[in-house]
Amino acid sequence: LAEALAETRNSEHEVEFICARSECLPPVGVRTHIVGRPGGLKFIKMLWFLIRAEQVRKRGNYDLVISLGKTWNQDMMRVGGGPQKTFWELSEKAWPAGFSRWFKHLRRRLLPSNWLTRIIDNHQYRSGCRIICVSDAVRHWTQKAYPGIPVPEVIYNLPDLSRFTPPTPEQ
């Protein structure tokens, strides 16, 4: 997304990307802000990114902020997998009935990182930002989890078929 924006930008706007870490050089025309990622519990990593990304956003005085993750304030939000509570409802059936399902349910509700995810989700979905879902199914899950929000738009992610080849007989 950052690369596409950089290719189409005009001279009035710059493309900046706020991330916890970067594993490669940014595309031409994109400036990264690496906020770091402390070790330890997932809750600490998430909270660190939430706070640091918000600090960079405020200092940046951006015209448009697009969120691809767990950020506090944004103008547009891309939803890839749907809300956490919907994921829990759908995936709970994958666990066998009985103790293992009950224990998974309990662990999900006790983990501080899941509390933080729920808080961020609730804020993001109810913030009034424009919501873009990657499929009709994700839009349905989003509307079910957050009734009353504006209807999200759907923009499908198309695969890059040039990256895939049929398997060889040896494969």
Segment roles from a protein language model:
Residues 55, 104-134, 150, 154:
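Membrane-proximal helix-turn-helix segments that form the acceptor-binding/catalytic region
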Residues 66-67, 73-104, 132, 153-154:
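Active-site proximal beta-strand in glycosyltransferases
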Residues 137, 158:
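Carbohydrate-associated surface elements
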